């Protein structure tokens, strides 16, 4: 008698199939690595897909220079332990402008350092397929995105011009200059991600676990004081309001644009229990998602992840 796969094993098998399919179909794929929990799961699945061999493609981190310090330390640790072929790209135009989320705002900062930075890297290395860790349950525009998300020669996404995906059949044919973004975790939920991390004991950035951290409330968002740069952009009143609180992060990005949540969950089982009870989206803490109605879809149309 054949044992039935659990839903996590079914999701795992589906994701591994997608990763292998892309590696077979495309000439120069790359895996985007944002250092977050979804990237950790996607990287784990990719290593499983080609074990005992090495990944047949590099991993790409589009750096904004404003990630949490713990994320940078974790990235270097993973590269060292796993022997990853890591490419790091920072938009030189953004560096020249001293781009930051305080002076230029979240929308401009994200466009220059993330969207344009990603497009530069994809063009520079000639990648024709890029794996991303987005899931359909995260946000409305992502809910309607295909597993194979086709982009034109300028990396733009047209939601009205996407191919049908029947069962596990994917059409990877692209014209010269076109590319695709591939989302192997499309059908996973946030709870699935955490349960799989627990099941597989996947290492993740410690920021996901609750700890006493210095925070300041900015426009209703609890922002962690990660380094001294932020202090020069705070008013005297805001500096005076800095305090310590038990918080953790459900999602990670540029630290001034990522809100912490009050929590006492210090272990994976406690995080899973918290996920079973929560009724809010993990991306409620992402400032860039609140720029304007439909802002995420517009970002994706311009070439965002």
UniProtKB/Swiss-Prot annotation:
Gene Ontology biological-process entries: hydrogen sulfide biosynthetic process; sulfate assimilation
Catalyzed reactions per annotation: sulfate + ATP + H(+) = adenosine 5'-phosphosulfate + diphosphate
Keywords attached to this entry: ATP-binding, Nucleotide-binding, Nucleotidyltransferase, Transferase
SUPFAM superfamilies recorded: Adenine nucleotide alpha hydrolases-like
Superkingdom per UniProt: Bacteria
Keyword ATP-binding among record annotations: yes
Gene3D superfamilies assigned to the protein according to its UniProt record, in alphabetical order: HUPs
EC numbers on record: 2.7.7.4
UniProt KW Cell cycle keyword: no
Function description: With CysN forms the ATP sulfurylase (ATPS) that catalyzes the adenylation of sulfate producing adenosine 5'-phosphosulfate (APS) and diphosphate, the first enzymatic step in sulfur assimilation pathway. APS synthesis involves the formation of a high-energy phosphoric-sulfuric acid anhydride bond driven by GTP hydrolysis by CysN coupled to ATP hydrolysis by CysD.
Protein name, UniProt field: Sulfate adenylyltransferase subunit 2
Species of the source: Stutzerimonas stutzeri (strain A1501)
Lineage: Bacteria, Pseudomonadati, Pseudomonadota, Gammaproteobacteria, Pseudomonadales
């Amino acid at each position: 008698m054949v044992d039935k796969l659990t839903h996590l094993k079914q999701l795992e098998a589906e994701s591994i199939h997608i990763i292998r399919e892309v590696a077979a179909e495309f000439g120069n794929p790359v895996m985007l690595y944002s250092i977050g929990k979804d990237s950790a799961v996607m990287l784990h699945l990719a290593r499983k897909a080609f074990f005992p061999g090495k990944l047949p493609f590099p991993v790409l981190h589009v750096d904004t220079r404003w990630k949490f310090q713990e994320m940078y330390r974790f990235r270097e640790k993973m590269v060292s332990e796993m022997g990853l072929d890591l490419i790091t790209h920072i938009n030189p135009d953004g560096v020249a402008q001293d781009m930051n989320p305080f002076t230029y705002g979240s929308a401009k900062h994200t466009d220059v350092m993330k969207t344009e930075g990603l497009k530069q890297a994809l063009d520079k290395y000639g990648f024709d397929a890029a794996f991303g860790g987005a899931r359909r349950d995260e946000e409305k525009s992502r809910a309607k995105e295909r597993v194979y998300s086709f982009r034109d020669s300028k990396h733009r996404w047209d939601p009205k011009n996407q191919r049908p995906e029947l069962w596990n059949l994917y059409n990877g044919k692209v014209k010269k200059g076109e590319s695709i973004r591939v989302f192997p975790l499309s059908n996973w939920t946030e709870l699935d991600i955490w349960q799989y991390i627990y099941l597989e004991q996947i290492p993740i950035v410690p920021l996901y676990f609750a700890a006493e951290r210095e925070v300041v409330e900015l426009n209703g968002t609890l922002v962690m004081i990660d380094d001294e740069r932020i202090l020069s952009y705070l008013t005297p009143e805001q500096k005076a309001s800095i305090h310590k609180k038990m918080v953790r992060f459900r999602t990670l990005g540029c630290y001034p644009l990522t809100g912490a949540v009050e929590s006492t969950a210090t272990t994976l089982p406690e995080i899973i229990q918290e996920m079973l009870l929560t009724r809010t989206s993990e991306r409620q803490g992402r400032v860039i998602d609140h720029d304007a109605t439909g802002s995420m879809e517009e970002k994706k149309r311009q070439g965002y992840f």
